[in-house]
Design a protein with these regions (language model features):
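Loop/helix patches that line or flank the sugar-binding groove of alpha-linked glycan CAZymes
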Residues: 3-6, 10, 14-26, 34, ...
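Catalytic-adjacent loop/helix segments of enzymes that bind and process anionic phosphate/sulfate esters
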Residues: 30
Length: 192
């Protein structure tokens, strides 16, 4: 379910075994700035609030209502690091279409904005290939393509050694193969 509230403690109240939710998007981590202390705080809050109710955690970096994490964090290196974190945490990760390509929000020219909430940029179509229609056909989509769609598309990144798509696939394969990544606990270690 979607529980659009700003605190994990409030999300946790909607979990249960009767008429309540068994799984809900947990939005507070989505709003974490690119700071280790902020991420740690949100992860700890999520674990504490949901573990207290024997509830299953979920993790979200981007969605159709918020700027893509690559856009928010400002670089592919940060988007890759966030993907590693997302897919290493116990719980259910949600990948928004295009995260595995490192897509940024599309730039919407004045006059083409349709969503009154300004969410069009994160809703741009996913580019499948480098051709002009990016795998969607000859017609122009109602939203413009994300930046660098000629390179950041499934066909190109599938073949590019070390691409963020290849990283995402390796991380997902490791997660499927490792119960520890899906179900295990972790502890924080001090960093220099």
């Amino acid at each position: 379910g979607e529980v659009a509230v700003p605190w994990t403690e409030m999300v946790a109240r909607h979990y249960g075994t009767n008429d309540e939710l068994h799984l809900a998007f947990n939005f507070p981590p989505l709003f974490a700035p690119w700071e280790a202390s902020s991420w740690r705080e949100r992860i700890d809050q999520t674990r504490s609030a949901l573990d207290a109710r024997d509830a299953w955690p979920t993790w979200v970096l981007s969605n159709h209502d918020n700027r893509r994490h690559r856009t928010r964090y400002g670089s592919e290196a940060r988007a890759r690091a966030a993907a590693v974190l997302l897919l290493a945490l116990r719980g259910t990760p949600f990948l928004y279409a295009g995260e595995e390509l490192g897509l940024e929000d599309a730039v919407i020219p004045p006059g083409r904005t349709l969503d009154p909430g300004g969410r069009d940029g994160c809703r741009a179509p996913l580019p499948w290939d480098a051709e002009p229609g990016h795998g969607w056909g000859a017609h122009e989509p109602w939203l413009p393509w994300p930046p660098d769609a000629a390179h950041r598309n499934v066909d190109t990144l599938r073949e590019e050694a070390g691409s963020i798509l290849q990283l995402s696939r390796r991380l997902l394969a490791a997660r499927r193969a490792s119960p520890a990544l899906r179900l295990g606990e972790f502890r924080w270690l001090p960093a220099p």
